[in-house]
């Protein structure tokens, strides 16, 4: 059976895959995102940035899989960033930065871009490479100051792209979205399905043995 390797430490991405019948092998990439973004240049299109980050993450775990003896697998790498006012925003990292971002996006709309990369390896060699991005418009509410401060205090928005989540506490402050919900969470199932097809893999081949596939 082909292994499904998730090149991410994201609990949200893992949860999406598990709910969709896939039990991934998790191998976290060590890509220096800031260095790669700098290398791409200030004029790089936002869609190109997130896609190249996803590709780098998928490729980065190849030596780890070789070390671990995983020679037949599909590797999925993802990267999400929020595009607002023409600028890409990743993880805020601190309460002050998250607060500043919420002050600029409350009551407004922004686009969550998620780059996706799928590599297929057979007998240790890359035999398939597909990549693309998804774009979902997110319409934000204007949370009262007390609610926003309470949200910031949880720490949840500090380590997620755009300083919000859709599937957890941050969902209270999202009025609606236009696009794929799973992409906003971090891994778009419709896009991953298409990329898997591009490298010759059907999703049912990857379902965990639970009555849904074998």
UniProtKB/Swiss-Prot annotation:
Keyword Hydrolase in record: yes
Family: Belongs to the Maf family.
InterPro entries (UniProt xref): ITPase-like_fam, Maf-like
Cofactor(s) recorded in Swiss-Prot or TrEMBL: a divalent metal cation
Organism in which the protein naturally occurs: Rhodococcus opacus (strain B4)
Its biological purpose: Nucleoside triphosphate pyrophosphatase. May have a dual role in cell division arrest and in preventing the incorporation of modified nucleotides into cellular nucleic acids.
Active site as annotated: 79 (proton acceptor)
GO process annotations (BP): nucleotide metabolic process
Enzyme class: hydrolase
Catalytic activity: a ribonucleoside 5'-triphosphate + H2O = a ribonucleoside 5'-phosphate + diphosphate + H(+); a 2'-deoxyribonucleoside 5'-triphosphate + H2O = a 2'-deoxyribonucleoside 5'-phosphate + diphosphate + H(+)
HAMAP family in UniProt: Maf
Location within or outside the cell: Cytoplasm
GO molecular function, one term: nucleoside triphosphate diphosphatase activity
Identification of the protein by name: Nucleoside triphosphate pyrophosphatase
GO annotation, cellular component aspect: cytoplasm
Keywords: Cytoplasm, Hydrolase, Nucleotide metabolism
Taxonomic classification: Bacteria, Bacillati, Actinomycetota, Actinomycetes, Mycobacteriales
Primary location group: cytoplasm
EC number per UniProt: 3.6.1.9
């Amino acid at each position: 059976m082909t292994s499904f390797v998730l090149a991410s430490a994201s609990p949200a991405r893992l949860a999406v895959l598990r709910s969709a019948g896939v039990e991934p092998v998790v191998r976290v990439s060590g890509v220096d995102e800031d260095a790669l973004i700098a290398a791409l240049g200030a004029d790089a299109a936002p869609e190109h940035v997130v896609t190249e980050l996803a590709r780098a993450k998928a490729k980065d775990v190849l030596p780890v899989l070789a070390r671990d003896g995983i020679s037949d697998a599909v590797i999925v790498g993802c990267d999400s960033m929020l595009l607002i006012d023409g600028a890409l925003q990743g993880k805020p990292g601190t309460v002050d930065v998250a607060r500043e971002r919420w002050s600029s996006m409350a009551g407004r709309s922004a686009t969550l871009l998620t780059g996706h990369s799928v590599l297929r390896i057979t007998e240790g060699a890359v035999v398939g490479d597909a990549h693309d991005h998804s774009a979902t418009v997110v319409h934000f509410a204007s949370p009262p100051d007390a609610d926003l401060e309470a949200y910031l205090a949880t720490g949840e928005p500090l380590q997620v792209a755009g300083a919000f989540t859709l599937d957890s506490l941050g969902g209270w402050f999202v009025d609606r979205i236009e696009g794929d919900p799973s992409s906003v969470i971090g891994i778009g199932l419709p896009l991953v399905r298409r990329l898997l097809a591009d490298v010759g893999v059907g999703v049912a081949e990857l379902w965990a043995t639970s009555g849904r596939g074998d």
